[in-house]
């Protein structure tokens, strides 16, 4: 399909809303050879965009499980990655991404229960700051780029082990050279959870 598209005059391409597979973006990049390509990330609560990553198709493309990096925060925004005990993780360690800054919402209108679940006050750089809990599993690499591993609610626990369904999907796609894959948990007749994979 991409072979039929030629958009040499396009100057900018911004990817948003969903995690972007590197192999698909490489193909798309051939259709827009003169465009700068950016991957933007952000939940609605952060007024949609809070981080960005400029993709260099002629260089190394940062990714996690085949999905593009979400980059670094825009000016005026802060991101932190915390563990289950609300401690900042070391670079290279996975945790939940939190965002803060002027464009992050003050909260949900007249919904204190939801606000209590979605926001935390955190001592960051000497200031107690309000952060939004994204629910996204990420890590920060040595270059301060944020790598996205999927939703925490897409992570499952089976027999005491945390399993990232997105990682299973990535390896399935990689084994056949692309395409789609979906991993999910189902209950067997004996009521024990098992993982199924369709690709």
What are the functions of these language-model segments?
Residues 33-39, 54-199:
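AMP-dependent adenylate-forming
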